[in-house]
């Protein structure tokens, strides 16, 4: 039996076909009830007799509508019929071999530690594969993957920052497809910017297939007024524009894909840069970015949020660099970009090394967050305070300045990153599933391995922990990417800085060995490391930096980590250089 669905207010069709086989002498009939197609099976059984039910489902989708609906639906049904000619064991064997080959190339292995750690990595990679529409660049990764209808399947900045890196270092063609999703939706982003009085592209906070803003207008109830509160993210959480540009540059530097950067990448960089240039306001002789929400999200409608301003600067800076490199003829843009970079005010690091989150954060009072941190992820702070009240205190939902330190590591010293971590983490409740992973990576870069592992482990328990209701609406898709990030960018110390691949490995004491695959500029690497040494096998000669020192690898090389010292200032030296 099959059903063809034409989605309302859309341009897509879905066909669902089902074949149910039942062993033995059975009677079957079919009915339709309340928009359901039902197959009824009855059988007379003796004690100990076994009946086997085999159900095969084929789901098809299209958005071109070139063929007549019935003809397309019949073609989809024929695909099911072809599969039904094979036995369950035959279909299982094909699937098993496909997964075997995939795991052989992609699996990350950990020796030592608890069984949970390896299971968490396997769990993360499994979902990172199945929930990514690698076959369709007009779709992206839903906030709940394929496991539930939370957030209505919408796409957030989570994709570019938490999910794309896995694909970038595992299968760059998938990362390219995810970025082309944003490129296809440029018209909607340009229209949103225009409606708000700006130029360039303002991508929606919650995105779907059309590229239009999908964020609901209202959400939770204000505990003081009893009224529904407006969702402010779509109005002012504009950092996702720069996050997308950051992902474009990460892709470009990791792959060297000139065909992409000269076309789709250039368009994304220029349009996002134009947005920031028009978004800035002049205050005396400087440009500032006002009325924004940073990743924190508990601090709303502030001026000069550090994350937003630094990322906007990076966005325009990289757009200008690519424009010059690939011969952009838009002289007006180049002039405006140069002036923006010259005049934009960036929050300055204080003498104690802390970067203020925004213009007003440091003047707000701090409160004891112990009971709220103990219930991290539950947003219990909003049971005691309204959002307006939370906004007037030093309270973070998730990493903000620490997130900036993670995304642009080359721009901040290790001392400043440590100062920010020590200042902001006690003020962070970790009410977002994404917060602890980022704190863990920055902690690892600062040499705080015990704290880093604790953050990573707690991040794995968001959906794999004791709470049976953590994924009632679906798993936290981005948190699966965060598990990979914590292991590879945290403990293995993988990062891309100024176009170079860096490895600054430091395993937690719970792990004796970590082995993982890595793609870099056309080369397939296999990296295996422990506390003393690192082995790198490559499909072609490659250069990278190990603890800051440039090394070359051909075929397979083993390095003693004791020969590569990483001082606190982040500049590597060998023992010989020290002498």
Residue ranges of model-derived segments:
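Acidic/polar, glycine-enriched structural segments that form the non-catalytic walls/loops
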Residues: 1-151, 385-389, 568-579
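The feature captures the catalytic groove of carbohydrate-active enzymes
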Residues: 61, 147-155, 205-263, 271-342, ...
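Gly/Pro-rich turn-and-neighbor structural signature
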Residues: 106-139, 309, 329-360
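Contiguous, well-ordered alpha-helical segments that form the cores/surfaces of helical PPI scaffolds
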Residues: 122-129, 149-153, 157-168, 234-250, ...
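Helix-terminus loop motifs that line ligand-binding clefts
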Residues: 132-147, 173-246, 252, 259-261, ...
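Active-site core of glycosidic bond-cleaving carbohydrate-active enzymes
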Residues: 155-185, 237, 246, 263, ...
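C-terminal capping/lid segments that line or modulate ligand- or cofactor-binding pockets
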Residues: 162, 207-210, 214, 298-326, ...
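C-terminal beta-sandwich/jelly-roll accessory domains of carbohydrate-active enzymes
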Residues: 537-578
């Amino acid at each position: 039996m099959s059903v063809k669905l034409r989605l309302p207010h859309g341009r897509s069709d879905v066909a669902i076909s089902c074949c149910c086989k039942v062993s033995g002498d059975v009677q079957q009939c079919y009915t339709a009830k309340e928009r359901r197609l039902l197959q009824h099976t009855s059988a007379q059984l003796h004690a100990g007799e076994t009946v086997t039910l085999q159900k095969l489902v084929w789901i098809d989708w299209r958005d071109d509508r070139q063929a007549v609906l019935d003809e397309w639906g019949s073609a989809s049904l024929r695909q099911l019929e072809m599969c039904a000619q094979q036995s369950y064991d035959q279909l299982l064997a094909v699937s098993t071999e496909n997964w075997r080959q995939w795991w052989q190339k992609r699996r990350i292995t950990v020796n030592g530690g608890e069984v949970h750690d390896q299971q968490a990595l396997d769990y993360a990679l499994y979902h990172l594969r199945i929930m990514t529409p690698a076959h369709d660049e007009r779709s992206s990764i839903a906030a709940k993957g394929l496991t539930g209808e939370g957030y209505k399947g919408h796409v957030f900045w989570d994709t570019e920052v938490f999910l794309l890196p896995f694909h970038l270092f595992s299968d760059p063609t998938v990362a390219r497809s995810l970025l082309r999703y944003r490129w296809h939706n440029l018209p909607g982003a340009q229209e949103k910017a225009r409606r708000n009085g700006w130029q360039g592209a303002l991508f929606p906070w919650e995105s779907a297939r059309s590229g239009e803003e999908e964020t609901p207008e209202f959400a939770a109830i204000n505990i003081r007024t009893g009224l529904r509160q407006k969702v402010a993210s779509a109005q002012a959480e504009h950092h996702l524009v720069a996050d997308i540009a950051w992902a474009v540059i990460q892709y470009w530097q990791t792959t060297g894909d000139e065909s992409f950067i000269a076309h789709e990448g250039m368009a994304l960089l220029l349009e996002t840069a134009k947005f920031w240039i028009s978004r800035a306001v002049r205050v005396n002789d400087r440009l500032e970015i006002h009325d924004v929400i940073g990743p924190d999200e508990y601090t709303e409608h502030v001026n000069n949020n550090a994350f937003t301003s630094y990322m906007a600067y990076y966005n325009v800076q990289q757009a200008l660099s690519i424009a010059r490199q690939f011969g952009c003829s838009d002289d007006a843009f180049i002039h405006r970009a140069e002036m923006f970079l010259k005049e934009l005010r960036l929050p300055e690091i204080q003498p104690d090394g802390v970067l203020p989150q925004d213009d007003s954060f440091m003047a707000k009072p701090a409160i004891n967050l112990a009971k709220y941190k103990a219930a991290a992820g539950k947003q219990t702070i909003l049971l005691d305070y309204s959002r307006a009240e939370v906004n007037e205190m030093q309270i973070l939902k998730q990493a903000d300045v620490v997130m900036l330190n993670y995304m642009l590591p080359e721009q901040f010293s290790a001392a400043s990153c440590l100062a920010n971590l020590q200042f902001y983490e006690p003020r962070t409740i970790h009410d977002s599933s994404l917060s602890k992973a980022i704190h863990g990576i920055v902690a690892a870069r600062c040499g705080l391995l015990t704290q880093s592992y604790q953050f990573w482990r707690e991040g794995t328990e968001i959906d794999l922990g004791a709470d049976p209701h953590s994924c009632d609406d679906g798993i936290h898709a981005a948190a699966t990417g965060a598990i990979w990030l914590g292991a590879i960018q945290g403990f293995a110390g993988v990062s891309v800085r100024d176009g170079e691949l860096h490895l600054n490995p430091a395993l937690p004491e719970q792990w004796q060995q970590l082995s993982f695959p890595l793609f870099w500029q056309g080369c397939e690497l296999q990296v295996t490391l422990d506390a003393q040494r690192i082995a790198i096998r490559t499909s072609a000669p490659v250069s990278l930096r190990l603890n800051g020192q440039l090394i070359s690898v051909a075929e397979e090389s083993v390095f003693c980590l004791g020969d590569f010292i990483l001082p606190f200032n982040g500049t590597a030296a060998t023992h010989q250089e020290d002498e």
